[in-house]
């Protein structure tokens, strides 16, 4: 049994605990029947529900872009392919740079990869779980949640996180290379050359974004907002056209991928968008309760991390929440000290969703890549913390240290 299978078994263990809690909550609660242990698992049933309810949000984000992937590859290919080949990189890296893996990046990367499976997975699941989500999701969503006065720390954190994405990608690529990733029994050949050469365009984009956030942060952040709105419009167009094609047979946009199984698809080998979403939700049934219960059971060690980093307990809790979903963390930012704000935003760039949606997506689409993806995301997130700690202004760091000491 490999590490990827072990991770799945662990999540299914937590899924069963959460299912028990949901059942017992109908008859007075887990504590009533299971005593102290029941009290320790109460609330996991609610996370069980959250995992399944995520299906709707995932569908809105994924289905349209998944259907559009071959169309976008056909339209963008003549421009993207020559540029990336000139840089010595695979064109699939374009997809993971701008799109989250679960918002079309994985499928667009496959279309642009030209048959290079390693490059497709490197972009679609490793890069596409770090840079793409930051640009199309995290920044626009954060701007709608955080206080205007905290935009400074968002920009600082994203800057720190962006520059360490290549470190996380290389780490994930090396784990994939040495763990012997296979698809349908066939080995996927990750090489040093592939891992390093494909980082060239990523480094260029990372440097440009970092410079923009350093010198024109407001304009850069507004630019991300505009791009995100355009992307939502495009995804909605793709979803509407795909549904019309499925229900009425009208091909409003030629070349769309089917969103349900089509004639010739082999069950278990080919999964279309709707089935992928269902598979992700099944994984999230265990992933969300796992994060809740691990946070509860190991609260003291986790809070001690906050003291080591000289930030308050709210900031430490935000980092843990980020591993499942960064939206709660952004909601907590107003209660964090300034050092914690910068560190949390930096950590979220790579590490967000590592034990949530991205884990579910990898498990549903390519479970051999679960461990490489998680390692890459966590290393990218941890190194981003180090950079953020250097970027936090000295006066903010001193204030944070004083506040952390007062809480201890």
Residue ranges of predicted features:
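Intrinsically disordered, low-complexity segments enriched in Gly and acidic/Ser/Thr residues
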Residues: 287-288, 301-307, 314-319
